[in-house]
From Swiss-Prot:
Gene Ontology CC terms: cytoplasm
UniProt lineage: Bacteria, Bacillati, Bacillota, Bacilli, Lactobacillales
Protein name: GTPase Obg
Protein source organism: Streptococcus equi subsp. equi (strain 4047)
Gene: obg
GO MF: GTP binding; GTPase activity; magnesium ion binding
Residues of the Obg domain: 2-160
Domain OCT: 359-437
Role noted for this protein: An essential GTPase which binds GTP, GDP and possibly (p)ppGpp with moderate affinity, with high nucleotide exchange rates and a fairly low GTP hydrolysis rate. Plays a role in control of the cell cycle, stress response, ribosome biogenesis and in those bacteria that undergo differentiation, in morphogenesis control.
Residues holding Mg(2+): S174, T194
Length: 437
């Protein structure tokens, strides 16, 4: 049996774009041969793709770093470098992807074949053929490739099941799943026999089918992490119907009604929306002594909490071991599923905007100026830094082009307003140059 893993942290890095090339044609009567350097190729993106054959995130336990290949450099004769292929990473259905730094949900992957770009590849740098003008017919300018996006991600698997079984340990959830489906969960006469979620397909006598999940037993304080706690509570979030299994034999000395109230409090504390899901009470172990008496007492206690009799939850007395009452329970569950819509885990406000990593937002601040301890002026800002990394510092014309870009952004004027004088050191990252007023 493969190990079950439902959380993982990974780092992804898209490929860098290939550098543009400075090259010239070797033809008579063409100044300097004419520009002939091609563009660099696009860097590969990192893409998550849903594979319905996967059931766990175990593949990410030892392989946590994923890096796509960079694009090829531009070539002579105006030929572009080859773009790199995207890196496709398979994930199971029900995988939620978060940005580890911001905690923002990037996507919720639930459909087989669904894809999402988690790190976008960098654009290839332009070759010098792109910079030819009537005033400069033979430019010695080419751009470096754009860096690929790099991210730290948190993956969380919430299994896809129509029906979730909840209840205290040893109330018979695993036994119930084993007799109504082909699932083979571990069953034992001790607490927390089930330590991972088990999923089984159920088929009713009328031909309806649905997926049922047996979740590890809950105890008081589970929503705060007591016992197996929130480690597996997440898996009930995708279910549409909850089967609340209760041991009506009270064989372990617990009160069935107190168990019912305690579990519902844990569900509500973990996620208020869990209580919006329709719930069927499964009174299990009815073949045991005193179970009928306990059930009658349970019904009376439950009814006392409701003013409207029609709002009372449905109760189905069963015995998983004796195979009693199962058909009617499954038929009622199928009927309830048929009239219950899916519950949306994340709305548009929860999901991070899917925007190009290097796209300039209208409100994006172009640059910032600060003063270092050594009195150097330090320039920073996403837009400015992107322009810098794409500047080929080995070419004088490229450096001059970058200087013009800084001037156009208002950097020179801003430095003067801050008090910069001729000869002052200006720093971008580790690169330094003198301010010329």
């Amino acid at each position: 049996m493969s190990m079950f893993l439902d959380t993982a942290k990974v780092s992804v890095q898209a490929g860098r774009g290939g550098d543009g090339m400075v090259a010239f044609r070797r033809e008579k009567y063409v100044p300097n041969g004419g520009p002939w350097g091609g563009d660099g190729g696009k860097g590969g993106s990192v893409i998550f793709k849903v594979d319905e054959g996967l059931r766990t995130l175990i593949d990410f336990r030892y392989n946590r770093k994923f890096k796509a290949k960079s694009g090829e450099k531009g070539m002579t004769k105006g030929m572009h470098g080859r773009g790199s292929e995207d890196l496709i990473i398979s994930v199971p259905q029900g995988t939620t992807v978060r940005d580890a730094e911001t905690g923002k949900v990037l996507t919720d992957l639930v459909e087989h074949g669904q894809e999402f770009v988690v790190a976008k590849g960098g654009r290839g740098g332009r070759g010098n053929i792109r910079f030819a003008t009537p005033r400069n017919p033979a430019p010695e300018i080419a751009e470096n490739g754009e860096p690929g996006e790099e991210r730290q991600l948190e993956l969380e698997l919430k299994i896809l099941a129509d029906v979730g079984l909840v209840g205290f340990p040893s109330v018979g959830k695993s036994t119930l799943l084993s007799v109504v489906s082909s699932a083979k969960p571990k069953i034992g006469a001790y607490h927390f026999t089930t330590i991972v979620p088990n999923l089984g397909m159920v088929r009713t006598k009328s031909g309806e089918s649905f997926a049922m999940a047996d979740l590890p037993g809950l105890i008081k304080g589970a929503s705060q992490g007591v016992g197996l706690g929130t480690q597996f509570l997440r898996h009930i979030e995708r279910t549409r119907v909850i089967l609340h299994v209760i041991d009506m034999s009270a064989a372990e000395g617990r009160d069935p009604y107190e168990d019912y109230v305690a579990i519902n409090k844990e569900l509500e504390a973990y996620n208020l929306r869990l209580m919006e899901r329709p719930q069927i009470i499964v009174a299990n172990k009815m073949d045991m002594p005193e179970a009928k008496e306990q059930l009658q007492r349970f019904k009376e206690q439950l009814a006392a909490q409701y003013d409207d009799f029609e709002e009372l939850p449905i109760i189905f007395p069963i015995s998983s071991l004796a195979h009693q009452g199962l058909d009617s329970l499954l038929e009622a569950t199928a009927e309830l599923l048929a009239k219950t819509d899916d519950f949306l885990l994340y709305d548009e406000a929860d999901l991070a905007e899917d925007e190009a990593y290097y796209g300039f937002a209208a409100e994006e601040k172009a640059f910032e100026i600060s003063r270092a301890d050594d009195a150097a002026w330090v320039l920073s800002g996403e837009k400015l830094e992107r322009l810098f990394v794409m500047t080929n510092l080995e070419r004088d014309e490229s450096i001059m082009k970058f200087a013009r870009q800084l001037r156009g952004m208002g950097v020179d004027e801003a430095l003067r307003e801050r008090g910069a004088k001729d000869g002052d050191i200006v720093r971008i990252g580790k690169f330094e140059f003198e301010f010329v007023d």
